[in-house]
Amino acid sequence: MHKYLYIAAGGAAGSLCRYLVSGVTQRMFATSFPIGTFSVNMIGCLFFGLVTGLFEERLGLPPEMRLLILTGFMGAFTTFSTYMFESTNLIKSGQWAMTALNIGGQSILGFACIVGGLALGRLIVS
């Protein structure tokens, strides 16, 4: 049960930070480009890599802190960092085809799912 509390606490903080960072960045640059989301995703990748590099590979990250920081906080802040981390692991293990499938598949199918979901939603309400 405690593991769910770590994830929930991290998730609450991560979603709040995502909202704040994205909103402030978008207002700061006042552009139609989604710079807020772009910034959150890049910050998330940097932070995920930093935490993993520092703690998991060198200093040891207790399982509870992994749940709090990586699963909870980062999971709510951005899943893009997890997507990139998993792609990096595929590259490290020499699985180039799987890397291309993961990156290409998630990008293309994700876009198609958004378009399909929007169309389905509009169809349902019309």
UniProtKB/Swiss-Prot annotation:
Alphabetized UniProt keyword annotations: Cell inner membrane, Cell membrane, Ion channel, Ion transport, Membrane, Metal-binding, Sodium, Transmembrane, Transmembrane helix, Transport
Protein name per the record: Fluoride-specific ion channel FluC
Regulation: Na(+) is not transported, but it plays an essential structural role and its presence is essential for fluoride channel function.
Reactions this protein catalyses: fluoride(in) = fluoride(out)
Protein origin, superkingdom: Bacteria
Main localisation: membrane
Keyword Transcription regulation: no
Binding site for Na(+): 75, 78
Encoding gene per record: fluC
Subcellular location: Cell inner membrane
UniProt membrane topology term: Multi-pass membrane protein
Annotated TM spans: 4-24, 35-55, 67-87, 100-120
Family per similarity comment: Belongs to the fluoride channel Fluc/FEX (TC 1.A.43) family.
